[in-house]
């Protein structure tokens, strides 16, 4: 089987790994391709040659027709020139009138055309400007409508915020009143507690005074007890001595 690379290189080189049979087939196909290419070149050359001959004949025919017309027109011009000289009436060439009419007409036509073009341009620009202004006006109007809606919503929100602020202020006032009342109550309770502490302090002072008095009394009692004990002992000693003496 032939390799798939046989025609990938446009017959520049045979595939390097093909067998001898594959190479023969490649050579035959290459020869057929060369013959087909040469035949196509010959056909194109023949068509080009036929076209060249046809164009040459048409050119020669055209040159002959133009020369015949020119010769006839030149002969007619000479005859009319002789006739005008003999009659003494020399006319301006028609091309001058045609040039003047065409020139002036062309100038006015260009002027009017330019004016029409300018008018159309101005109209189109005016229409474009008007459309743009209308579009911008519509946009601005829509934005204003949207802004009015937003402002209305903001007003509603502001009214609600004012109401909420009033409610909060009322609650704050109530809380302040309650707080003030509670502070006054607490202050009164603290004052009462202070008074009780003062009373307790006074009672402690009185108790201290009483304790001091009791201490003094105890000291007096102790002193008296000591004297009583001493007297008792002395009396006992005296009694014992008297008993010894009596014995």
Curated annotation (Swiss-Prot):
It is found in: Cytoplasm. Disulfide bonds: none annotated. One of its GO terms (cellular component) is cytoplasm. Keywords: Coiled coil, Cytoplasm. Residues 27-63, 138-225 form a coiled coil. Belongs to the UPF0612 family. This is UPF0612 protein P20C8.01c. It comes from Schizosaccharomyces pombe (strain 972 / ATCC 24843).
């Amino acid at each position: 089987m032939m390799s798939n690379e046989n025609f990938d290189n446009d017959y520049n080189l045979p595939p390097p790994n093909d067998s001898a049979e594959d190479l023969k087939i490649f050579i035959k196909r290459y020869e057929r391709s060369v013959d087909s290419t040469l035949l196509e070149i010959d056909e194109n050359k023949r068509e080009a040659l036929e076209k060249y001959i046809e164009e040459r004949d048409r050119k020669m025919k055209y040159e002959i027709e133009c020369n015949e017309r020119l010769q006839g027109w030149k002969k007619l011009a000479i005859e009319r020139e002789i006739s005008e000289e003999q009659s003494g009436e020399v006319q301006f060439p028609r091309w001058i009138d045609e040039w003047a009419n065409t020139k002036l007409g062309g100038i006015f036509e260009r002027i009017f055309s330019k004016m029409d073009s300018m008018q159309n341009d101005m109209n189109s620009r005016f229409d474009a400007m008007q459309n743009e202004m209308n579009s911008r006006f519509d946009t601005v109007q829509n934005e204003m409508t949207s802004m009015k809606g937003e402002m209305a919503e903001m007003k509603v929100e502001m009214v609600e915020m004012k109401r909420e602020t009033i409610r909060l202020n009322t609650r704050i006032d109530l809380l302040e009143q309650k707080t003030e009342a509670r502070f006054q109550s607490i202050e009164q309770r603290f004052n009462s507690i202070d008074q009780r502490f003062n009373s307790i302090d006074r009672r402690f002072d009185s108790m201290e005074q009483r304790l001091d008095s009791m201490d003094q009394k105890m000291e007096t009692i102790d002193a008296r007890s000591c004297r009583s004990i001493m007297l008792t002992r002395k009396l006992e000693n005296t009694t014992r001595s008297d008993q010894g003496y009596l014995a």
